[in-house]
Amino acid sequence: LLVVLVMVVILLLGRERSSIYRDESETKALIHQTGQNLVEIQTFDTAKQPRSIYLTEIPSRVFVSEGSILESLLALGQGDRIVAASISGASSGAYERIRQEYPEELEKVPHIAPQGMNREQAVAYAPDFIMGWQSAFTLSRFGTVSWWQERGVNTYIAATSNHVLKYGTIE
């Protein structure tokens, strides 16, 4: 559900790309300079520490790691923004269920890997936003959140993944 809320916020921006602004002073300077509205999204880093990202535009090249996140985006009609999806555990039948429930949206996704991808494969898709579970942002998978941030790519770690938050409240 949190992923759905994040995507709704992104949709409300009405732009085509995302931007990273690392601190409050830089964010205020950008608002003053451009007059653009920013949307703050609270997420986590690789070490499960809270962090914020600020979006000025809708991500247009989203890389998705995990079937549940893919399903949420497809349910919101965002298949055309997804450049690739890495679905681990595809043998569980989750992919088949997604394929049957959202066939038109799934057709818009250029590449879906039934096995996990690595960082080099993710880089090849030139994403501007990566959504996944905390376990995807390790050196052995896609690399750390800071690695992507240094390259101008926003990341979103679902709070419900890999015990990032023990308990949560949706407001």
Please report, for each region that a protein language model flagged, where it lies by residue.
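Bacterial Sec-exported substrate-binding components of ABC uptake systems
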Residues: L1-S72
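Structured C-terminal subdomain patch of bacterial secreted/periplasmic proteins
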Residues: R17-I20, P110, M117, N162, ...
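Extracellular/periplasmic catalytic domains that process cell-envelope and extracellular macromolecules
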Residues: Q33, Y54-I58, G77, V123-A124, ...
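Predominantly a core beta-strand signature of beta-propeller blades
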Residues: L38, K108-V109, T155
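Residues at the C-termini of beta-strands that transition into short coil/loop
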Residues: D45, S86-G89, A159-T160
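A short, structured surface patch at a secondary-structure boundary
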Residues: V64-Y125, F129-F137
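Extracytoplasmic substrate-binding proteins
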Residues: F129, S140-E171
